[in-house]
Amino acid sequence: MQIEIKDGRSDNSPLPERKLVTLIQESYDSLKBDNEINLSTESTSNLLIKLVLEKLEKHSSLYKYIASVTTLNIEGLNEENANFSLKNDIGASWESKKDGIFNYKLEDKNSNECYLITILWLHK
């Protein structure tokens, strides 16, 4: 199944795009590696949002950050059986030279879940 992410306005990000991807992936990996977290009872998306926001705040306090995670259960979906539709729109009033948005798709083949992550930054 092919899920496409169309990027927003990330050219003015407080971090390079590669660093944002690494930050998201490392946050997710640390959740999976933490034996004290029971992911069957804890919300993976809420924990991921918390970790990503904590790391972003350490990089720059000049911005306010917003993180959103949409979780898709992709178990049993394939090219012939892709029977779901998802639409998510977001709007903001911002200064285009300082503020922006970054979208990223994170797939976990072991749990059959896909996370669509959106990060927004607004200059203070």
Curated annotation (Swiss-Prot):
Keyword Cytoplasm: yes
Gene3D superfamilies referenced in this protein's UniProt entry, alphabetically: Tctex-1 (3.30.1140.40)
Main subcellular location of this protein, as a coarse class: cytoplasm
Compartments where found: Cytoplasm; Cell projection
GO cellular component terms, semicolon-separated: cell projection; cytoplasm
Superkingdom, natural source: Eukaryota
Keyword Transmembrane: no
InterPro entries linked: Tctex-1-like_sf
Keyword annotations of the record: Cell projection, Cytoplasm
UniProt similarity note: Belongs to the TDA2 family.
Protein name: Topoisomerase I damage affected protein 2
Organism lineage: Eukaryota, Fungi, Dikarya, Ascomycota, Saccharomycotina
Gene symbol of the encoding locus: TDA2
